[in-house]
């Protein structure tokens, strides 16, 4: 298992639409395990394969305080959503940035687990928000896309400045 490189905005690879996983096999399971290692190392609660330059429909999530409730969503489909909510979201691909994003309060998804078994899951609150955030990544959408063009431009400038500072160190 290993920690993968997380892509950072404005990297255009974050905009690539992920393709469905054709078969859940040992290679896919290794990707899932590496994604969990990466997410935990980066102190995130969710990670989409797109964020680590793997353009397949794979999401890993763990919103638990203890970091012991792993959720794998392969080829996730949103089948129901209801209610309105929103929290200040952050993203491993957009460091040091948070913004209020409107989301559905409850979702129901269908997906495959790490073993390739189909399941359905109903989620609310933080888990529902995290699922929606990560599913956006699979279609090349970032949480800042919900913001005004001016706010997005300011974030881009801030991150470009951070990248320059980091490249000097």
UniProtKB/Swiss-Prot annotation:
Fe cation binds at residues 91, 133, 137. Belongs to the polypeptide deformylase family. The keyword rRNA-binding does not apply. Coiled coil: none annotated. It is an enzyme of class 3 (hydrolase). This is Peptide deformylase. Keywords: Hydrolase, Iron, Metal-binding, Protein biosynthesis. PANTHER family: PEPTIDE DEFORMYLASE (PTHR10458:SF21). InterPro entries: Peptide_deformylase (IPR023635), Peptide_deformylase_sf (IPR036821). Binds 1 Fe(2+) ion. The active site is at residue 134. Disulfide bonds: none annotated. The keyword RNA-binding does not apply. Removes the formyl group from the N-terminal Met of newly synthesized proteins. Requires at least a dipeptide for an efficient rate of reaction. N-terminal L-methionine is a prerequisite for activity but the enzyme has broad specificity at other positions. One of its GO terms (molecular function) is metal ion binding. It holds the Pfam family Pep_deformylase. Its cofactor is Fe(2+).
């Amino acid at each position: 298992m290993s920690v993968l490189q997380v892509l950072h905005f404005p990297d255009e690879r974050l905009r690539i639409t992920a393709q469905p996983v054709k078969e859940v096999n040992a290679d896919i399971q290794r990707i899932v395990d590496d994604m969990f290692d990466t997410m935990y190392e980066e102190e995130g609660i969710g990670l989409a394969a797109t964020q680590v330059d793997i353009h397949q429909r794979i999401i890993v999530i763990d919103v638990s305080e203890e970091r012991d409730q792993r959720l794998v969503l392969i080829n996730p489909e949103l089948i129901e959503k209801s209610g309105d909510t929103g929290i200040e979201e952050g993203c491993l691909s957009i460091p040091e940035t948070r913004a209020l994003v409107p989301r559905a309060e409850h979702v129901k998804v269908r997906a495959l687990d790490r073993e390739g078994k189909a399941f359905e899951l109903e989620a609310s609150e933080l888990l529902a928000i995290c699922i929606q955030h990560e599913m956006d990544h699979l279609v090349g959408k970032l949480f800042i896309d919900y913001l005004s063009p001016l706010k997005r431009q300011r974030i881009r400038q801030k991150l470009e400045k951070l990248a320059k500072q980091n490249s000097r160190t």
